[in-house]
Amino acid sequence: MKLPLLLALLFGAVSALHLRSETSTFETPLGAKTLPEDEETPEQEMEETPCRELEEEEEWGSGSEDASKKDGAVESISVPDMVDKNLTCPEEEDTVKVVGIPGCQTCRYLLVRSLQTFSQAWFTCRRCYRGNLVSIHNFNINYRIQCSVSALNQGQVWIGGRITGSGRCRRFQWVDGSRWNFAYWAAHQPWSRGGHCVALCTRGGHWRRAHCLRRLPFICSY
């Protein structure tokens, strides 16, 4: 009885060894084709981090998608490609110098009362005054500009802020490339329905998102 038992045990051991060998041979090619998770992570983080940071900083309202459809083309094309190169510079009587900016002796701002789209206004500031649409970085400058436009028969004026990017990677930028470190939004802004460009309200000085194809007065810095 011992001999059949020994033969059965020996046969079982050989079968188990053979099965293990076949399993190892089958798994090896599959493992070679599959990248380890820790090798995928760095590249994924580099691609996803900017969007993730923006998701934490900004949440957008339900109207933002409609706004992107309406004037998204304005955001993706540079100013020289968008406007009429024959656009004439404003007459002197249509401009007002903004003076008395506290704490900034070299700051020069100009209110242009002629009505233009955001892109036209941006181009006019660059071409006619060798400047840019104004960027605002503190309350004092915002207040002084608001005082200079309060007498206008218009509810808003263009400043140099706009939305760039798409989806959850959208963010606000100044067209002159300076840092976005100050904002003075009106109630429920910037999350409520609006456009991709930023306008300053002539009463109160608060900011609102506006559709870029609207024609408004504007402020140049030069």
UniProtKB/Swiss-Prot annotation:
Keywords: Antibiotic, Antimicrobial, Cytoplasmic vesicle, Disulfide bond, Glycoprotein, Heparin-binding, Immunity, Lectin, Nitration, Proteoglycan, Secreted, Signal. GO terms for molecular function: carbohydrate binding; extracellular matrix structural constituent conferring compression resistance; heparin binding. Pfam families: Lectin_C. Disulfide bonds join 125-220, 197-212. SUPFAM superfamilies: C-type lectin-like. The keyword Disulfide bond applies. Residues 1-16 form the signal peptide. Glycans are attached at residues 23-25, 34, 62, 86. This is Bone marrow proteoglycan. It comes from Homo sapiens. The gene is PRG2.
